[in-house]
């Protein structure tokens, strides 16, 4: 169990989980509010 916890706390795993969450969040925001990203640039 300690090895699994150490593996899940490594940088590539955390980066993958964070990027997946961020991409999903942006996709959902664009689903409810389309073309909002174009207003900021």
Swiss-Prot record:
User: What GO CC annotations are associated with the protein?
Assistant: chloroplast thylakoid membrane; photosystem I
Q: Name one GO biological process term.
A: photosynthesis
Family the UniProt entry places it in: Belongs to the PsaJ family.
Instruction: Provide the taxonomic classification.
Output: Eukaryota, Sar, Stramenopiles, Ochrophyta, Bacillariophyta
Q: Which UniProt keywords apply?
A: Chloroplast, Membrane, Photosynthesis, Photosystem I, Plastid, Thylakoid, Transmembrane, Transmembrane helix
How would you describe this protein's topology in the membrane? Single-pass membrane protein
Give the Pfam families listed for this entry: PSI_PsaJ
Which HAMAP family does the entry link to? PSI_PsaJ
The name on file for this protein is Photosystem I reaction center subunit IX
Q: Does the keyword Membrane apply?
A: yes
Q: Which residues cross the membrane?
A: 7-27
């Amino acid at each position: 169990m300690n090895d699994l916890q150490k593996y899940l706390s490594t940088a590539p795993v955390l980066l993958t989980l964070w990027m997946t969450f961020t991409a999903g969040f942006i996709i959902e925001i664009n689903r409810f509010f389309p073309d909002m990203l174009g207003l900021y640039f």
